[in-house]
Amino acid sequence: MHATTVKNKITQRDNYKEIMSVIVVVLLLTLTLIAIFSAIDQLSISEMGRIARDLTHFIINSLQDWK
């Protein structure tokens, strides 16, 4: 009986940790999206195109250096 109770408490704790992890990830993604849309709202379209092009080049160069 005691082993079952301990196992149930461990399972509940693991479930709690998993749920909290999901909540943290969702909050971080939400904040990231808010920041991205705020930046897009403040910049003009031409600036966003230049930033996207520069970011793409940076990512491609980083991936090539990583190999």
UniProtKB/Swiss-Prot annotation:
TM regions (residue ranges): 19-39
Keyword Nucleotidyltransferase: no
Stretches of the chain found on the membrane's Periplasmic side: 40-65
UniProt keyword list: Cell inner membrane, Cell membrane, Membrane, Signal-anchor, Stress response, Transmembrane, Transmembrane helix
Induction trigger: By acid stress, via the EvgS/EvgA system.
One GO CC annotation: plasma membrane
Membrane topology annotation: Single-pass type II membrane protein
This protein's record includes keyword Transcription: no
Subcellular location: Cell inner membrane
Cytoplasmic side stretches: 1-18
InterPro entries, per the entry: SafA
Domain of life, source organism: Bacteria
SUBUNIT field: Interacts with PhoQ.
Biological function: Connects the signal transduction between the two-component systems EvgS/EvgA and PhoQ/PhoP, by directly interacting with PhoQ and thus activating the PhoQ/PhoP system, in response to acid stress conditions.
Family recorded in the similarity comment: Belongs to the SafA family.
Protein name, as recorded: Two-component-system connector protein SafA
Native source species: Shigella flexneri
Organism ancestry: Bacteria, Pseudomonadati, Pseudomonadota, Gammaproteobacteria, Enterobacterales
